[in-house]
Amino acid sequence: MAPLKLNSRNLSQIFAAGKSLVKVPTYQRNGAVKEGIVHIGVGGFHRAHLAVYVDRLMQEQGVTDYAICGVGLQPFDSTMRDALASQDNLYTVIERSAKGSFAHVIGSINSYLFAPDDREAVIAKMANPDTRIVSLTITESGYYYNENTHELQKEHPDIQFDLNPVNENKPRTTFGFLYAALERRHRLGLKPFTVMSCDNMQKNGSITRHMLESFARQRNPKVAEWIAEEGAFPNAMVDRITPQTSATDKTALAENFGIEDSWPVVTEPFMQWVIEDKFSDGRPPFEKIGVQVVKDVHAVEQFEKHKLRLLNGSHSAIGYPGQLAGFNYVHEVMEHPLFSKFVWQMMQQEVKPLLPEIPGVNIDDYCNTLIERFTNPTIMDQLPRICLNASGKIPQFIMPSIAEAIWVTAPFRRLCFVAAAWFCYIKGIDDSGKAFEVVDPMLNELQAKARAGGTNPSELLSIKNLFGDDLRTDPRFLKEVTKAMEDITRDGILKTLPKYID
């Protein structure tokens, strides 16, 4: 039987053909529901995480006023627009593990707006009273957050453009759109919508608040004051490994489940979301569908710290050295005995001792779960995805552990090796001399500094919006990173790794 094109009309046939291996939405969509969530940045992670939770709300709890309107701000988002439009905004989540795979058609995205076509439509949608939450997955670089000063990058050309009142109705950045919509709601006497970051950053809600308030103060102090007093920016920890979708994944979906989907999502069974209970205009009952809703922001921060430093820090330890060594996938790296020992020892000896205890959480169990997830061969998690946009990741995932270790005189050699591997990775040449693509919003500056510095990290460490003065001037850190860079450059990753394994 030929695969069925994914659309609303074919859902019942897709369900019947897939038997127990395929789930489809049975709730009402389109005009029968309100779009209470506007989501900026509809990529793989959003479709495997927040959109799945909202699908559960609609399917299991009968929620009808929190469907999602997706928004794409960038020209490349036209690909997502076209993919969703061709199948009534439906898509398939393929969940894979060693136990097998199953497919879940998600219907929580009810519509999609492409900002380059109509920026006013996006502003009007966010200003609509039905919109209670505007959620974000815009990656670290989308926040224009200076890691060194902890302030908005007001000098950035896109921020400068959006701060000009002449451009209020044609913004480029997320903050330009948020401000324009909130200013309109302020004039209309409406409550501000909750701005809910779903990005993988520590204190994501607090950073979002600070950046938006800083932006708003430049435009209208009264609106900024209203946002500060009435707005809500919950902090959250999000987790689900979501590799890039390949042509092979689409073919497997058609052959194994009978679904023709132009852009499915592949992911793992594990999914977690811890969010602060801070909303300005209501929220759905997230806690009823597996979300950990907590009153205390401190609890969120502790979960965030565990996840960012253990999971994402380990991903960095797998990604940059792994790509330099010529590997392609996360599970391939972890199958190598040197890497598996290195990652485990870094977690146990250098990261874990610096982490706070969380009641009810066993850190060793969490570490074992991470190893199990990293070694899952079925999701084929690509190293280039792990390595993407490192300038927004390394300062969060690796450098804070190094800084704390220096402060308390704890071991940090393996963490320095990871930092050194990234510095070498920036040049885009692996240990066999093969070139690979480096994708980073700061690529030109990073590569210029990397070439100028050679095996000396000082040039890269001089980038002040990435690295603080505490690391830049610490002789122990400089010594460890320089030595690791020299060894990696001379001998390669696999010959250098044994020096970092007990």
From Swiss-Prot:
Molecular function via GO: mannitol 2-dehydrogenase activity; mannitol dehydrogenase activity
Record family assignment: Belongs to the mannitol dehydrogenase family.
Ligand binding (NAD(+)): 37-48
Summary of the function given for this chain in its UniProt record: Catalyzes the NAD(H)-dependent interconversion of D-fructose and D-mannitol in the mannitol metabolic pathway.
EC annotation from Swiss-Prot or TrEMBL: 1.1.1.67
Source organism phylogeny: Eukaryota, Fungi, Dikarya, Ascomycota, Pezizomycotina
Catalytic reaction equation(s): D-mannitol + NAD(+) = D-fructose + NADH + H(+)
Keywords: NAD, Oxidoreductase
Signal peptide: none
Domain of life: Eukaryota
InterPro entries per record: 6-PGluconate_DH-like_C_sf, 6PGD_dom2, Mannitol_DH, Mannitol_DH/Oxidoreductase, Mannitol_DH_C, Mannitol_DH_N, NAD(P)-bd_dom_sf
Subunit organization: Monomer.
Organism: Aspergillus clavatus (strain ATCC 1007 / CBS 513.65 / DSM 816 / NCTC 3887 / NRRL 1 / QM 1276 / 107)
Protein name in UniProt: Mannitol 2-dehydrogenase
